[in-house]
């Protein structure tokens, strides 16, 4: 099966571990990657939708039969073993991801791909003692943010000092900007300008956002 750029980007952030869980697994491609590469001993795939979970069950049927994968239909982390070492949560809103973690448990390692509210997710992780070791944006049709976070005691991850700008735009994006991230900034500037052009009055919040994005873009393109 040919994995999409999005799936490949997520897989690239998954580290070897003993136990792995894919929450909101959809087709189960990331779990397949972990198992095919012998990157985990066992895995749990979960989804709140039995229909979506069945896709992963079909893809991973041989591993399920062999006892290496356990499929569970549940909300969030409800039926995920609390000793799970690494958890992937991708394709959900940032608020939903934070709710799942608040109501569940905090695993040693997380790979997250929030669809919205990524700055809030960054702050949430830092407040709970995680070191965010990867934080970048890529494009696969849409723009996606990916975060890899670990507790420092897990594998010796070193916390990185986050500024307000890092929280808003992403630590790695600001230090090693990809063409995809620069495209995102250009697109966001166009959207802000279009909103301001269509507005009948001043929109201070949009003007302030445009100024922040423009400043970041100018800083990054001067240094590229």
Give the location of each predicted region.
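Conserved alpha-helix/loop element of class I SAM-dependent methyltransferases that forms part
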Residues: 2-17
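Conserved class I S-adenosyl-L-methionine
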Residues: 17-26
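Glycine-rich SAM-binding Motif I of class I
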Residues: 28, 32
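Conserved S-adenosyl-L-methionine
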Residues: 36-42
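Conserved SAM/SAH-binding beta-strand->alpha-helix loop
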Residues: 49-50
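S-adenosyl-L-methionine
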Residues: 54-82
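C-terminal substrate-binding/active-site "lid" region of AdoMet-derived donor-dependent transferases
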Residues: 102-150
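An accessory alpha-helical subdomain
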Residues: 152-224
